[in-house]
Amino acid sequence: FNPCPYSDDTVKMIILTRENKKHDF
C-alpha cells in the first residue's frame, strides 16, 4: 500500500515548484 497519492514524477515536479517559489521570495 502506498500512502502517497502522487507518482514519482509528480512528486519531483512538486519539489521543483516549491524550490522555485523559495527562490522567488
Swiss-Prot record:
It comes from Vespa velutina (Asian yellow-legged hornet). It is an enzyme of class 3 (hydrolase). It comes from the Eukaryota. Keywords: Allergen, Cytolysis, Disulfide bond, Hemolysis, Hydrolase, Lipid degradation, Lipid metabolism, Secreted. It catalyses: a 1,2-diacyl-sn-glycero-3-phosphocholine + H2O = a 2-acyl-sn-glycero-3-phosphocholine + a fatty acid + H(+); 1-(9Z-octadecenoyl)-2-hexadecanoyl-sn-glycero-3-phosphocholine + H2O = 2-hexadecanoyl-sn-glycero-3-phosphocholine + (9Z)-octadecenoate + H(+); a 1-acyl-sn-glycero-3-phosphocholine + H2O = sn-glycerol 3-phosphocholine + a fatty acid + H(+). One of its GO terms (molecular function) is lysophospholipase activity. Contains six disulfide bonds. Expressed by the venom gland. This is Phospholipase A1 verutoxin-2a. Its EC number is 3.1.1.32, 3.1.1.5. Is about 0.95% of the total proteins in the venom. Pathway: Phospholipid metabolism. GO terms for biological process: killing of cells of another organism; lipid catabolic process. GO terms for cellular component: extracellular region. The lineage of its organism: Eukaryota, Metazoa, Ecdysozoa, Arthropoda, Hexapoda. Catalyzes the hydrolysis of glycerophospholipids such as phosphatidylcholine (1,2-diacyl-sn-glycero-3-phosphocholine) and has a moderate activity to hydrolyze lysoglycerophospholipids such as lysophosphatidylcholine (1-acyl-sn-glycero-3-phosphocholine), but is unable to hydrolyze sphingomyelin. In addition to acting as an allergen, it possesses a potent hemolytic activity on red blood cells of mice (98.8% of hemolysis at 3.0 ug/ml). Activity is maximal in the presence of calcium. However, unlike phospholipases A2 whose catalytic activity is strictly calcium-dependent, this enzyme shows considerable catalytic activity on phosphatidylcholine emulsified in calcium free solution; the catalytic activity of VT-2a assayed in the absence of calcium ions is 18-20% of that assayed in solution containing calcium ions. It is found in: Secreted. Belongs to the AB hydrolase superfamily. Lipase family.
